[in-house]
């Protein structure tokens, strides 16, 4: 036996709930992006150290990585 439950919300409350859900989703997305960038930077630091890169080589690697991030950003828009 199944029952259907109807919830009543005050007028406008649905909009507020939806807005809250969007804000929470954006916050989670930003948190995930920050974690991904942090992990990538750590990987680059390990690579630079293990490869005994010079400062100039490390700077070039960081420039290429910055270009990659920029290109990914443009693909999303």
Swiss-Prot record:
Cite the Pfam families for this sequence. DUF2732 (PF10809)
Q: What is this protein called?
A: Uncharacterized 8.8 kDa protein in GpA 5'region
In which domain of life is the source organism classified? Answer: Viruses
